[in-house]
Amino acid sequence: MTQIIPALDLIDGEVVRLVKGDYEQKKVYKYNPLEKFKEYEKAGAKELHLVDLTGAKDPSKRQLALIEKLAKEVNVNLQVGGGIRSKEEVKALLDCGVKRVVIGSMAIKDATLCLEILKEFGSEAIVLALDTILKEDYVVAVNAWQEASDKKLMEVLDFYSNKGLKHILCTDISKDGTMQGVNVRLYKLIHEIFPNICIQASGGVASLKDLENLKGICSGVIVGKALLDGVFSVEEGIRCLQNA
């Protein structure tokens, strides 16, 4: 069944939202991250998603103490991403109690290391974040979305699916933080070609209709801004996915 996955982005312990990954376009929310995650858990969320934007910019400043506190205090699965660049960082996060670690640019820039991580920690512990942008074809963006690679999305998926990959987080970066709706066509395409891969959709979720459109296509839908801005609640999202 498709799950709603509430998300928080954190900079120095503060809940924020960026538009299209731009640190200059930052909105700060006056929420305590632990209280917010507890609220989402109480509402029925079975998984939570956290982006460590401080650690993404500077791995030496990764918010490990806070992440460990969050992982221990919530009773549902927590997945964490944000500029993971090494095997040591993956291990540190898993040791903190994180259920899954999200890996992004490394999948494109260092496939050997990425495959080592998949093998060492197992496919259930790793999510590949494949942030895409539509050129003549869907290509994967790297370096916090600052540049498009020459790698086509479907070729990357083909490569990793043959190496045991189970979970991906796919963001259409033209949609992220814009509340313009999700790219259903993109997720349908991935699901048709790679039915055994669990897809987490991200970017642009603006209404319950978006959730409805993704039911049965994606294993999860990551929702950040729409929940923080009160467009709909976790309870409404769960009901929508159960009834659609």
Swiss-Prot record:
<dbReference type="InterPro" id="IPR013785">
    <property type="entry name" value="Aldolase_TIM"/>
</dbReference>
<feature type="active site" description="Proton donor">
    <location>
        <position position="131"/>
    </location>
</feature>
<dbReference type="GO" id="GO:0000105">
    <property type="term" value="P:L-histidine biosynthetic process"/>
</dbReference>
<dbReference type="Pfam" id="PF00977">
    <property type="entry name" value="His_biosynth"/>
</dbReference>
<keyword id="KW-0368">Histidine biosynthesis</keyword>
<comment type="pathway">
    <text>Amino-acid biosynthesis; L-histidine biosynthesis; L-histidine from 5-phospho-alpha-D-ribose 1-diphosphate: step 4/9.</text>
</comment>
<dbReference type="InterPro" id="IPR006063">
    <property type="entry name" value="HisA_bact_arch"/>
</dbReference>
<keyword id="KW-0028">Amino-acid biosynthesis</keyword>
<protein>
    <recommendedName>
        <fullName>1-(5-phosphoribosyl)-5-[(5-phosphoribosylamino)methylideneamino] imidazole-4-carboxamide isomerase</fullName>
        <ecNumber>5.3.1.16</ecNumber>
    </recommendedName>
</protein>
<feature type="active site" description="Proton acceptor">
    <location>
        <position position="9"/>
    </location>
</feature>
<keyword id="KW-0963">Cytoplasm</keyword>
<dbReference type="GO" id="GO:0000162">
    <property type="term" value="P:L-tryptophan biosynthetic process"/>
</dbReference>
<dbReference type="GO" id="GO:0005737">
    <property type="term" value="C:cytoplasm"/>
</dbReference>
<dbReference type="GO" id="GO:0003949">
    <property type="term" value="F:1-(5-phosphoribosyl)-5-[(5-phosphoribosylamino)methylideneamino]imidazole-4-carboxamide isomerase activity"/>
</dbReference>
<dbReference type="InterPro" id="IPR044524">
    <property type="entry name" value="Isoase_HisA-like"/>
</dbReference>
<dbReference type="InterPro" id="IPR011060">
    <property type="entry name" value="RibuloseP-bd_barrel"/>
</dbReference>
<dbReference type="InterPro" id="IPR006062">
    <property type="entry name" value="His_biosynth"/>
</dbReference>
<comment type="similarity">
    <text>Belongs to the HisA/HisF family.</text>
</comment>
<keyword id="KW-0413">Isomerase</keyword>
<dbReference type="InterPro" id="IPR023016">
    <property type="entry name" value="Isoase_HisA-like_bact"/>
</dbReference>
